[in-house]
Amino acid sequence: MTTHLDSRRPSPVIDDVRTRRSALRLLGAGALMAGITPVAAIGQSNDDNVLSEAAVLRDPDIPVAGNAGGDITIVEYFDYQCPYCRKLEPELQQALKDDGKVRLVLKDWPILGPASVYASQLVLATKFQGKFVEAHTALIGLDVRLTEPGARERLANAGIDVDRAIRDLQANQEGITAVLKRNDDQAKAFGFNGTPAFIVGKFRVPGALTRQQFGQVIADARKAAKKKK
């Protein structure tokens, strides 16, 4: 699978989900904003559902960046080898700073090879030392080809205890693998074709945005959320 860049405006979620195909495109009946399991999404019910609010927005195994108490959530599906993910990172971070009220949920979706998988696993393991955001920032800022030794070196230079991260990865391999599986299931269920891909409030965004475009979709998501109240 290759990365996917789509500059089109995001597609809003509508309130009429009748088919599985609709669920692959949309969050389903405003489900995430309303906290209701999507009608036609994968899974059986409630929190076991791949596209439930709990699974997508509030996975307890994924630390939250940005404003943890924000009123709008951005979920980013990314790969550390994705050039578009790297390129848009400053745009996204500036948009978050501009707004100040956005939760950012970073979902590793390593689709570009073994180096991506290793990097994602290692970064997820850094949460046990409270360094997930710092580790993510270090690797998403790479401007060279990602390798396993390079990932370790980059993390060490960012102040991460890499030896501990490796031990934590080994001790929590099953749980970390499960996180990546959940992320993969969700991204595929949303119909994303590559990275970067986003859920912004109730909008599906299959591609990179500029700072201004992020600001616009955040504003649109906030307006849509208010209409639901």
Go through each PLM region and give its residues.
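N-terminal secretory signal peptides
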Residues: 1-22, 29-34
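C-terminal segment of classical bacterial N-terminal signal peptides
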Residues: 35-40
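Conserved redox-active cysteine motifs that mediate thiol-disulfide chemistry
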Residues: 80-90
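Cysteine-centric redox/oxidoreductase cores and disulfide-bonded domains
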Residues: 110-195, 199-228
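Soluble periplasmic/extracytoplasmic beta-strand elements of cell-envelope proteins
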Residues: 73-76, 103-107, 197-199
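N-terminal "domain-start" segment that seeds a small globular fold
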Residues: 44-64
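Short active-site neighborhood of thiol/selenol oxidoreductases, capturing the structured segment around
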Residues: 68-81
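Conserved helix-turn-beta segment immediately C-terminal to the redox Cys motif
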Residues: 89-108
